[in-house]
A protein has these predicted regions:
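Structural microenvironment flanking redox-active thiols in thiol-disulfide oxidoreductases
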Residues: 72-116, 126-132
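Thiol/disulfide oxidoreductase modules built on the thioredoxin-like
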Residues: 57, 112-120, 124-169
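Signature tryptophan residues that serve as conserved aromatic anchors
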Residues: 41, 64-67, 71, 131, ...
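Short active-site neighborhood of thiol/selenol oxidoreductases, capturing the structured segment around
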Residues: 49-72, 78, 92-93
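Hydrophobic alpha-helical membrane-insertion segments, chiefly the h-region
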Residues: 10-22
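Positively charged n-region of N-terminal signal peptides that target proteins for export
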Residues: 1-4
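N-terminal "domain-start" segment that seeds a small globular fold
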Residues: 20-51
Length: 176
């Protein structure tokens, strides 16, 4: 009986990760941590992006790594949302946090960004400073930050793309 309970608990946790979680402890409706401590930056002419500099915009902070299959599966949606909503005030920032040592090399990340056709800003987070500031534990994870710098929505894993897109649109429609 105990074994069945342990197996059932593991399946529930794995399923929650695949389906997406919507609130991670301690961050819902909290001030979004800054993006400090990472680098280098790509698709920004090398200049860092800060949450403070993006006030008045809706920001998606995407935790990913180029070697993660789930991250690659959500990438078409990230690119689609960036293309569709960027002109309306949506900024997407990829935080590339390596799982394995080879994923932390600048050449690897630069080549992955080019190969995958990523046009939005990406920062390397080899020391997990940004990852830890967001209390993140999963790849991929998306944090939506409102125009006032508050985390208003989180999603972990794949799926529920329609829900996430509705959240982006709703946050964009809010007045400052």
């Amino acid at each position: 009986m105990r074994t069945l309970l342990v197996v059932s608990s593991c399946v529930a946790v794995l399923t929650a990760g695949m389906l997406g979680l919507h609130a991670l402890p301690g961050l819902a409706a909290a001030n979004a941590p800054d993006l400090a401590g990472g680098g280098p930056w790509f698709n920004t002419d090398g200049r860092p992006v800060t949450i403070a500099s993006l006030r008045g915009k809706v920001v998606g902070v995407e935790m990913w790594t180029a070697g993660c299959e789930n991250c690659l599966n959500v990438l078409p949606y990230m690119k689609q949302w960036y293309a569709k909503y960027h002109g309306q005030g949506f900024v997407l920032v990829g935080v590339h946090t390596p799982e394995f040592a080879h994923e932390g090399k600048v050449e690897y990340v630069r080549a992955a960004i080019a190969r995958l056709g990523i046009a939005y800003p990406v920062v390397m987070d080899n020391d997990y400073r940004i990852w830890n500031a967001y209390h993140n534990a999963y790849w991929p994870a998306l944090y939506l930050v409102d125009k006032h710098g508050q985390i208003r929505y989180t999603h972990v894993g794949e799926g529920e793309y329609d829900v996430t897109e509705r959240q982006i649109a709703a946050l964009l429609s809010e007045k400052i």
